[in-house]
Design a protein with these regions (language model features):
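C-terminal output helix
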Residues: 107-116
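Active-site beta3 strand of CheY-like receiver
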Residues: 45-51, 56
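Charged docking surfaces used in two-component/phosphorelay signaling
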Residues: 16-24
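The feature encodes the CheY-like receiver
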Residues: 57, 66, 75, 87
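Conserved acidic carboxylate
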Residues: 9
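Short hydrophobic/Thr-rich beta-strand motif most characteristic of the beta2 strand and flanking loop
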Residues: 26-34, 41-42, 103
Length: 125
């Protein structure tokens, strides 16, 4: 079965980066660039993993994480929060909202894939 990843990112270059990395892994992808469309995308796509930018247009990533985790149908989906605002208090608040993992931008391919492997329960390469 193909791993399904929902990429939530408003920056085109970052979306292209994630798409290229995950395509090399053979993951099935859905890309969303606007916070207002995320909850519908989660329901329609049923991802195995969500990568979530925290600063999005219309709805914050932190709020979306809380909503996804509150819903019994989506609460089990691991969410990797990715943000350019990488203060210790930011990370704590994002994890309290329900993020399973956290990465600060800029990030490397290895950092991204190691965290994804951990969240999906796959051996780290």
């Amino acid at each position: 079965m193909t791993t399904k990843v929902l990429i939530v990112e408003d920056d085109l270059l970052n979306r292209m980066f994630y798409e290229a990395v995950f395509n090399q892994r053979g993951y099935e992808l859905m890309l969303v660039d606007d916070g207002a469309r995320v909850l519908d995308a989660v329901g329609d796509f049923a991802p195995d993993l969500i990568t979530m930018d925290i600063h999005l247009p219309h709805v914050s990533g932190r709020k979306l994480i809380r909503e996804i985790k509150r819903n019994p149908e989506t609460a089990q989906i691991p969410i990797l929060a990715i943000t350019a605002y990488a203060g210790k208090r930011d990370e704590e608040g994002i994890r309290r909202a329900g993020a399973s993992g956290y990465l600060a931008k800029p990030l490397s391919i290895d950092q991204l894939l190691d965290e994804v492997d951990t969240l999906l329960g796959e051996p780290v390469h």
